A protein has these predicted regions:
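Acidic, polar-rich low-complexity tracts and alpha-helical solenoid repeat scaffolds
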Residues: 1-225
Length: 225
């Protein structure tokens, strides 16, 4: 019915609102391709769009791989502390990631992970924040602490073992071999890669203790290598 009103060739003062209704109808059906032009026309004419309007347009744009547009809409939503802002920060991180702006994505995921409104979104955001912290380094806090926070918060999560492996590598690359070995000991299953890391780290720690004259301690490490 909404499309019929728009297609009858008569412009009315209600056209803007009709575009919104039609666009949201398509949005609710998951037909983002059809929703996009209607929501776009509505936002182009609406001087004071609601936060929900902006979020919907950002989400639709992202689904259609118009990620630069999505970033623009989401960025209008992140100046508040609200459930919608938490979601917007997470989706903003996804859009930045799609465009290769990983540092910006890291910051967006961090902000989303610090909000408690939606536990599922918080978990997803913290997962991405931890992964990017490991990959890029983290200007806000120690990467290993971020990964450990995920493990502590979601000890039985589906991604926790993956995070434990990341923690091993994070400690290894920072040169903290004792923490690396401790993290290795908490893995449920060890891959060939982590077994090799365990051998090498044990040997390095053994050599350190041997050079200090701590032969008994060194022997324990050498037995693990």
């Amino acid at each position: 019915e909404g499309n019929e009103l728009l297609n009858n060739g008569k412009s009315t003062s209600y056209d803007t609102e009709i575009h919104k209704i039609v666009g949201e109808s398509y949005f609710m059906k998951g037909d983002y391709q059809s929703a996009y032009p209607h929501l776009k026309l509505f936002l182009d004419k609406e001087q004071t769009p609601s936060e929900s309007d902006l979020y919907e347009m950002g989400f639709v744009s992202a689904q259609l791989k118009k990620n630069d547009e999505a970033v623009g809409y989401y960025n209008q939503l992140i100046n508040s502390n609200s459930p919608l802002a938490q979601n917007a920060y997470y989706q903003l991180g996804n859009a930045y990631l799609e465009t290769g702006k990983k540092q910006e994505a890291l910051s967006a995921y961090r902000n989303s992970s610090q909000m408690n409104y939606d536990p599922k979104v918080q978990q997803l955001a913290l997962e991405q924040y931890a992964k990017l912290s490991y990959e890029l380094g983290n200007p806000f806090e120690n990467s290993s602490k971020v990964i450990q926070r995920y493990i502590d918060k979601y000890p039985s999560g589906s991604k926790t073992q993956e995070m434990r492996s990341l923690l091993v590598k994070s400690y290894l690359y920072s040169g903290d071999y004792k923490a690396t070995l401790e993290a290795l000991g908490k893995l449920d299953q060890k891959t060939n890669e982590t077994k090799k890391i365990e051998q090498e780290v044990s040997y390095l720690l053994g050599s350190e203790e041997f050079n200090k004259g701590n032969f008994d301690v060194a022997e324990k490490y050498f037995k693990q290598s």
